[in-house]
A protein has these predicted regions:
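Amphipathic alpha-helical interaction segments
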Residues: 31, 47-55, 78-81, 85-88
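Charged alpha-helical initiation segments
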Residues: 1-32
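Short, hydrophobic, well-ordered secondary-structure elements
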Residues: 25, 30-51
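A generic "cationic amphipathic patch" detector
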Residues: 37, 49, 56, 91-94
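Amphipathic, well-ordered alpha-helical segments in soluble domains
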Residues: 16-20, 39, 46, 77
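Long, charged low-complexity segments
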Residues: 60-122
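Short, charged/polar, low-complexity loop and linker segments
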Residues: 24, 58-60
Length: 122
């Protein structure tokens, strides 16, 4: 799934985000679904907080992306994984857990691609 991201988008990433993106791809290829969700939001946060992006990313595009339903869902889902409060879907250890995590990882992948497209299109 992650192989279809335009290489031009990758060139826009700072060195830290590039390393995270490489690990993200490895996690996706190895079905490490929780890691995919965590890394996808980490990459997005890196992009949104990199002041060098202000030279070529439109502020309206940033606001549009930050107000998206998928971006908010990903932040909530990532926080549920990292900050345990109670058992959450995908972590019950039953036969549907892996399926749930995979579906969520695919949605996280879609959100990351959307971030690349919205912020780095020309």
């Amino acid at each position: 799934m992650t192989n279809k991201i335009n290489e031009d988008f990758i060139k826009q990433l700072n060195p830290q985000a590039k390393v995270l993106f490489q690990e993200y791809n490895i996690a996706f290829e190895n079905k490490m679904w929780a890691s995919v969700m965590i890394l996808s939001l980490t990459i997005i946060d890196n992009i949104l907080n990199d002041i060098d992006n202000l030279d070529y990313v439109d502020g309206l595009d940033i606001n549009h992306f930050k107000s998206s339903k998928d971006f908010h869902w990903l932040r909530i889902r990532r926080n549920q994984i990292l900050h345990f409060e109670k058992p959450i879907e995908g972590f019950f250890g039953n036969k549907d857990s892996d399926k749930t995590l995979k579906l969520d990882a695919v949605r996280a992948d879609k959100t990351l691609k959307e971030c690349f497209y919205i912020l780095f299109r020309k």
